[in-house]
Amino acid sequence: MGGRMPFNQSFWEEFLMGREGRLPTLPEISHVSKRVVRILGGNPGSMHLQGTNTYLVGTGRSRILIDTAQVKQASFLRLQRAPSQLIHSKKGLPVWISRISSFLRTHNLELSYVLLTHWHGDHTGGVPDLLAHSPSLADKIYKNCPDAGQNPITDGQIFSVNGATVRAVFTPGHSVDHMCFQLEEENALFTGDNVLGHGFSVAQDLGRYMHSLGDMASLGCGIGYPAHGAVIGNLPEKLEEYMKHREGRERMMLSTLTREQAQGEGGRVGETKGGLTLNEIVIAMYGRVPQEVVEKALAPSLLQVLWKLAEDRRVGFKPGDPLKRRWFALDQRKRNRVRGYPS
C-alpha cells in the first residue's frame, strides 16, 4: 500500500538505547524447559534487547533449531525491503556459531530441521555459518517465502522430533512472511518478533499484525518463547497487553481527529480544511516536537495507525501528495459510502 513510511533504524537505536540498562541479564545458554534450550545470538543492543534468542527443541539426539542469529552489520529495521532483496553475502556473528556448535558437539546432538521465523537479518544471518559447519543441513532449512535453496513453510505444517511436535502458524504483520511455532507438548508458542519479552514490537502492516495477535491469542498457549527477551510466563496476558496498547493508539487517533474536526467548524483546523495533515495530527496529539522526531519516529508510527483505521473504514483521507494528505474521522453513516480509503 502506498504512502507508508519506513522506520529510521539509527534514530530508533539512539531513542531506545536507554532501555538496555534496564533489561534483566540472560545466560548465554539456558535450559528454559526440559525440552527447550535457549542460545543467545551474541548481538545485544537497543534493537535486539539481550540479543536474538535461538532455540533448540526436543528431548532426544535429534533437535529442531528455531532461528539462527545475526548477519554482521545487519539492519534489523529495513522493513521497506522485500525478503527476496535480502542477500546473505556476509557471515553471521562468530560467537553464535561457536556457542551452538559447541553445545551440539558436547551433548552429541544433531539438527533435523532449521526453522526461520522471518527474513530479517538478525534471525537468518547465521545460516551461512551453520551450513559451513554442517553442509548436510543444506536441505533442512525452512522459511516462509524461502530464499534460494531453502524449503517453504506452510501454515499448519508439522515438524516432529523425539519429545517435540512443532506446528507452524502464519502470523504476518511484523513482516510479510512471519511465522510463529506452537510447541504442542508444552502448550507454548515461539512468538518470533510479534511479541517480545520486554516492551513492544514494531509492525510493517498494523492491520495484519493486529489480526495475527488475535490468531495467536486464539491458540490458547500459556507460555511464550520470544525471539528477543525473557520467557513470557503468561502469554495470554502479554497478548492482551499488546492488543490493548495498539487499540489505545487507535482510540487516541480517532479522538484527536473527531475533536479537531468538531473544533474546525468553529474556525480551527479540521473540517473547514478537509481534515488534518500528519503534521497537524502530531501537533494535536503531542504538541510542538522537533521535526526530526516527527519524520523519523512519530510519522511512521502514526501512519501505521491511520492506514489501519482507513482499512477498517473508520477514517478517510483526501487523495494526493502523501505528505500533504488530509485525514478525517468517518461518522457511522459515511463509512460505507466514503471515497478515499484503501480497498
Curated annotation (Swiss-Prot):
Binding site for Zn(2+) 2: D122, H123
InterPro entries to which the protein is assigned, alphabetical: LACTB2-like_MBL-fold (IPR047921), Metallo-B-lactamas (IPR001279), RibonucZ/Hydroxyglut_hydro (IPR036866), Sec-metab_biosynth-thioest (IPR050662), WH-like_DNA-bd_sf (IPR036388)
GO annotation, biological process: secondary metabolite biosynthetic process
Annotated binding of Zn(2+) 1, by residue: H118, H120
Annotated catalytic residues: D122 (proton donor/acceptor)
Keyword check for Oxidoreductase: no
Gene3D superfamilies: Ribonuclease Z/Hydroxyacylglutathione hydrolase-like, Winged helix-like DNA-binding domain superfamily/Winged helix DNA-binding domain
SMART domains according to UniProt: Lactamase_B
Cofactor(s) listed in the protein's UniProt record: Zn(2+)
Nucleotidyltransferase among keywords: no
EC id: 3.1.-.-
Cofactor comment: Binds 2 Zn(2+) ions per subunit.
Keyword vocabulary terms for this entry: Hydrolase, Metal-binding, Zinc
Family: Belongs to the metallo-beta-lactamase superfamily.
Function in brief: Lactamase-like protein; part of the gene cluster that mediates the biosynthesis of neosartoricin B, a prenylated anthracenone that probably exhibits T-cell antiproliferative activity, suggestive of a physiological role as an immunosuppressive agent. The non-reducing polyketide synthase nscA probably synthesizes and cyclizes the decaketide backbone. The hydrolase nscB then mediates the product release through hydrolysis followed by spontaneous decarboxylation. The prenyltransferase nscD catalyzes the addition of the dimethylallyl group to the aromatic C5.
PANTHER family given in the database record: ENDORIBONUCLEASE LACTB2, LACTAMASE-LIKE PROTEIN APTB-RELATED
Name of protein: Lactamase-like protein nscB
Organism: Arthroderma otae (strain ATCC MYA-4605 / CBS 113480)
